[in-house]
Amino acid sequence: MKILLVHRQTKTVDKIKSVLSSCNPVVLHTESGLDGLLTSRIEHFDVIICGTDLPVVTGFELIRSVRTNSINRQTPVVIVCDEVDDKTIHLGQALDVLAMLPTKELDGLAEIVIQQVKVTPDRDWSELTSGSKAL
């Protein structure tokens, strides 16, 4: 499972990686929304997990751009924020977000990812293992 993790707080990033360790993920971490946005435009991920208070480009701007101009248009997104309020819920719904979690409830993240994220095989890897091409 390939995960793009865009969050600037080291403590939260470490907690997310720890919670998801049972999924054996490959996690690519960026601290700024701009780096996350650029990464999402060139590489496919099975899920994107992002914070809302990112430098340069906010989490909501990142998701909006991913949904309109990215190879990850259909990729599930989980928002991690300090507090989930009405504004966050409405923005998340408008951006078709899979889930919104407060940082204090990160233990539920693994369950959400395991139950609702479909892992897509890497096309290049499946071509190599299918036996259709000679090496």
Positions of the model-derived regions?
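Acidic catalytic/metal-coordinating carboxylates
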Residues: 32, 58-61
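CheY-like receiver
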Residues: 121-135
